[in-house]
Amino acid sequence: MKIHEYQGKEILRNFGVPVPRGIPAFTVQEAVEAAQKLGGPVWVVKAQIHAGGRGKGGGVKVAKTIEDVKRIAGEILGMQLKTHQTGPEGQKVRRLYIEDGADIQKEYYVSLVTDRATQKVAFIASSEGGMDIEEVAHSTPEKIITEFIDPLTGLGEEQAVKIANGIGLPPESTAQAVDIFQKLYKCYMDTDASLVEINPLNRDSKNALMALDAKFNFDPNALFRHADIVAYRDLDEEDPAEVEASKFDLAYISLDGNIGCLVNGAGLAMATMDTIKLFGGEPANFLDVGGGATAEKVTEAFKIMLKNPDVKGILVNIFGGIMKCDTIADGVIAACKAVNLSVPLVVRMKGTNEDLGKKMLAESGLPIIAADTMAEAATKIVAAVK
C-alpha cells in the first residue's frame, strides 16, 4: 500500500525526523489559506499522487507570493500529471501539499528496503539526492552505498556513522544524521513498511538536515495491525479493478496485454503468464482466485477482467488440489451466463474432480475451448485472440 508525501511526512514527524512545515489542500482556496497560515516568504506547491518524478512533470513548483500560490495551485489541481512512473496516461492531481521553502545547500538520498537475499534490511544511501536513484545507479553506481542491518541488533551508532561518512556528510552533520538514520530504521520496522525513502534529505547552509520528501510502501499483509496507516489509503490513486477485486479477496494486478487470466495459486498464475508470452501472447492481468474460490468469486473475477476493453480472450488454468475442478467449472458456467461472454474462453483443468469438471463444461452448451496442457491452452488462446 502506498501513501501520499504529506502523509509520509506526518509519520516521519511522529518518529522525530525533521520535516518542513506543510499543510495539505484540496482546493485553490485551501492552498491560499495554507500559504497564508505558513507565512512564507517562499512556499513549495506540490502535487500529491502515488508516483515519483513529479518535479520533472511540472507537479512541484516554487511560489514567492500568495498570488503565485493561487496561480500554481490552479494549474496543478486537476491536471493529468505524467511522470516516468505513471505511464503515458498520467494520474489526475486531486490534492496538493503547500510547504515551507527550504534553504538547500546539498541533497542526499536515503532509503530502507528488505533484502530477501540476505534476510536483512538494506539501508541504501547516496550523495546524489534530488534525482532518480535509478539514473544514479546506472550512470554512477559508485555513488551509492548499501549497508545491511541485522534485524536482531538494529542500526547501531557505528553503522550509522559509516553511512553518514560514506555519503560525504560533513562532521557538523554527523550526529544529527545518526539520529535521523536510527529513527528512520525504527519507523521502517514499527510501521511494517516495505520501503521508506527520503529523496532528498537536505543539508542547509548551517549543516542541519531535513527530509524534503517522503515515500512509503507498506506490507499489505501487516495492515491489519495498523489501522492508522489504513486510514491514509486513497482509493482514487489505485487501479479501480484492483480495488474491486480486493473486495472479493481476489489477488488482481492489471497488465497491458489482451488475454485475461484466471488461475488458482500465485506460482501457477506467474507460470501461466510466462507461457502465454512464450507462445506470442500478452497477459492482461494477474488474477489468483486462491484455494477457496466460489461460483460468486469466479463470476466477479470474470466481470472485473471484462471491464477492461482490451481483453479479447480469457484463459482459465486450474490445478485442483484444495480447490476442486467441479467447483471452478460451476463458477465458470455461471460467470459465462452472468456476463453474457462474447470473447473466446479456453479452460485447462487438472487435479481433484477433473473429469467431473470437464464433463460439466462440455455439457454446458457454452463455446468453451478445452485444453489438457498449459502449452496447448496458451497456444489456443493466443490463436483465438488474433
Curated annotation (Swiss-Prot):
Cofactor binding mode and count: Binds 1 Mg(2+) ion per subunit.
The uppermost taxa in this organism's lineage are: Bacteria, Pseudomonadati, Pseudomonadota, Betaproteobacteria, Burkholderiales
Q: Which terms are listed as keywords in the entry?
A: ATP-binding, Ligase, Magnesium, Metal-binding, Nucleotide-binding, Tricarboxylic acid cycle
Q: In which pathway does it act?
A: Carbohydrate metabolism; tricarboxylic acid cycle; succinate from succinyl-CoA (ligase route): step 1/1
Q: Which gene encodes it?
A: sucC
Q: How does it assemble?
A: Heterotetramer of two alpha and two beta subunits.
Instruction: Write down the Pfam families for this protein, in alphabetical order.
Output: ATP-grasp_2, Ligase_CoA
Sites binding ATP sit at: K46, G53, R54, G55, E99, A102, E107
Catalytic activity, as annotated:
succinate + ATP + CoA = succinyl-CoA + ADP + phosphate; GTP + succinate + CoA = succinyl-CoA + GDP + phosphate
Listed GO molecular functions? Answer: ATP binding; magnesium ion binding; succinate-CoA ligase (ADP-forming) activity; succinate-CoA ligase (GDP-forming) activity
Example of a GO cellular component annotation carried by this entry:
succinate-CoA ligase complex
Family membership, please give it: Belongs to the succinate/malate CoA ligase beta subunit family.
Question: A biological process (GO) annotation for this entry?
Answer: tricarboxylic acid cycle
Name of the protein in its database record = Succinate--CoA ligase [ADP-forming] subunit beta
Residues annotated as binding Mg(2+) are N199, D213
Source organism per entry reads: Polaromonas naphthalenivorans (strain CJ2)
- Database matches in PANTHER family: SUCCINATE--COA LIGASE [GDP-FORMING] SUBUNIT BETA, MITOCHONDRIAL (PTHR11815:SF10), SUCCINYL-COA SYNTHETASE BETA CHAIN (PTHR11815)
Q: What does this protein do?
A: Succinyl-CoA synthetase functions in the citric acid cycle (TCA), coupling the hydrolysis of succinyl-CoA to the synthesis of either ATP or GTP and thus represents the only step of substrate-level phosphorylation in the TCA. The beta subunit provides nucleotide specificity of the enzyme and binds the substrate succinate, while the binding sites for coenzyme A and phosphate are found in the alpha subunit.
- Domain named ATP-grasp is located at 9-244
Record's superkingdom? Bacteria
Q: Which cofactor does it need?
A: Mg(2+)
Q: Which Enzyme Commission number(s) are on file for it?
A: 6.2.1.5
Q: Where does substrate bind?
A: N264, G321, I322, M323
